[in-house]
């Protein structure tokens, strides 16, 4: 399979690239590879989905017709091998392996969460929260749960904490840095946001980390903070 433009990923960066290409080039072939289905949803809106404020359609950047309208060959699969000399990418798509030959390549897969090394975490029923699948898995796992600890006070952690309070959960947000959103806000702005989040019902612990997790009474787990 050959294509002029190959894009690995199919979210915000990929969509912007497709629109930019089509604004100056209506004819060249474009192929996008998405590991997730549906393709092209907004990760920052996952907390809104979890809280029940929107459905899956409400978090999509573009509708399904976008790909057809821009004549993009959309492949659902996982890119697992890149040969920069031969300009090829191998993609696992279902039971098939595709080799795609490209002229130009854009990798727009976004980030992956870094799971901290915490004693006992592997048996603690932990959840990541960066994909639609994560949100669906967490939603199922919240059934019958009253208390939730969120590790990380970045955009994902803050948004998730607020969504969880809307679901009636008691939430503790734990951030290693002296204030939340440390890469975005200064201490003063962060303090103002912290007060707003606390009023929403989130307990915030900054300058702290989770040392270990162990089983409490019944099915619950206890996080030891230091």
Where are the model-predicted features located?
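Beta1-alpha1 glycine-rich phosphate/pyrophosphate-binding loop at the start
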Residues: 1-73, 163-188
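Glycine-rich Rossmann-fold phosphate-binding loop(s) that bind the pyrophosphate
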Residues: 9-12, 130-131, 151-156
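A Rossmann-like FAD-binding core segment of flavoenzymes
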Residues: 27, 74-93, 100, 167-226
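FAD-binding core/adjacent interface of flavoenzyme oxidoreductases
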Residues: 1-6, 63-149, 222-226
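A general structural signal for well-ordered alpha-helical segments in protein cores
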Residues: 14, 43, 115, 135, ...
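Active-site/binding-pocket entry motifs
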Residues: 39, 112-115, 216
């Amino acid at each position: 399979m050959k294509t002029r433009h190959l894009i690995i990923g199919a979210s915000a960066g990929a969509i912007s690239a497709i629109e930019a290409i089509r604004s100056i080039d209506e004819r060249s072939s474009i192929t996008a590879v998405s590991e997730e289905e549906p393709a092209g949803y907004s990760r920052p809106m996952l907390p809104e989905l979890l809280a029940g404020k929107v459905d899956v359609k409400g978090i999509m950047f573009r509708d399904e017709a976008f790909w057809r309208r821009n004549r993009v060959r959309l492949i659902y699969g996982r890119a697992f091998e890149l040969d920069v000399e031969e300009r090829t990418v191998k993609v696992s798509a279902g039971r098939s392996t595709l080799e795609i030959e490209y002229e130009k390549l854009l990798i727009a897969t976004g980030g992956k969460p870094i799971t901290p090394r915490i004693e006992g975490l592997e048996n603690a029923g932990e959840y990541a929260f960066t994909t639609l699948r994560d949100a669906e898995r967490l939603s199922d796992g919240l059934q019958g749960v009253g208390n939730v600890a969120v590790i990380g006070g970045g955009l994902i952690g803050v948004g998730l904490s607020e969504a969880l309070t809307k679901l009636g959960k008691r939430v503790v947000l734990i951030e290693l840095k002296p204030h939340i959103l440390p890469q975005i806000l200064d201490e003063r702005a962060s303090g103002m946001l912290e007060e707003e989040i606390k009023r929403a019902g989130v307990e915030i612990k900054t300058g702290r980390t989770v040392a270990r997790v162990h089983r409490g009474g019944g099915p619950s787990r206890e996080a030891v903070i230091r």
